[in-house]
Curated annotation (Swiss-Prot):
SUPFAM superfamilies: Ribosomal protein L4. One of its GO terms (molecular function) is structural constituent of ribosome. Coiled coil: none annotated. Residues 40-71 are annotated as: Disordered. InterPro entries: Ribosomal_uL4, Ribosomal_uL4-like, Ribosomal_uL4_dom_sf. PANTHER family: 50S RIBOSOMAL PROTEIN L4, LARGE RIBOSOMAL SUBUNIT PROTEIN UL4M. Residues 44-53 have a biased composition (Polar residues). Transmembrane segments: none annotated. The keyword rRNA-binding applies. This is Large ribosomal subunit protein uL4. Part of the 50S ribosomal subunit. One of its GO terms (biological process) is translation. It comes from Hahella chejuensis (strain KCTC 2396). Keywords: Ribonucleoprotein, Ribosomal protein, RNA-binding, rRNA-binding.
Amino acid sequence: MELTINGAGKGTVSVSDVAFARDFNEALVHQVVTAYLAGGRQGSKAQKTRSQVSGGGKKPWRQKGSGRARAGTIRSPIWRGGGKTFAATPLDHSQKVNKKMYRAAMQSILSELVRQERLVVVEEMAVEAPKTKQFNAKLKDLGLENVLIVADAVDQNLYLASRNIPHVDVCDAVAINPVSLIAHDKVLVTVSALKKIEEMLG
């Protein structure tokens, strides 16, 4: 299929139908996005059981003859300073997603972006100096506000010029993910980045 390059007389760029003209599979995209978000969860909650609390190796008093209730350790859950009976453990929230499924979901998302005219292709996206004002002017010319910019390689000037603008993110072609593609109103891709994405997903 052919995608139009934004700009007067820029022409078109040919891309694979496999990566950019696939039917939208909502269930698969939902599964992959959920798995991606789950993988970012920390899951760092932890408490100590009686065996993990420091101390308590010695029996506090002898088993019989003292008249007191029998006790084997001062770290019993019923004692102050003891372990937790049912201690919380760190959780791994990650979900398994096969490479084939992930690739198909990414193809599905990109194809839907093309159908909804949310994918903007440009020859290149670069700024001469790390100036936010210059970069903002470029975005205004293209009529973009909430946008993900995908470049073949993000140089220092582009990164510094864009990092302070709300709702604008910049990434390399190899770093695209399902959540960032969906989250932005528009996705601006350079021709070289488009070819790299096609190579990865085609």
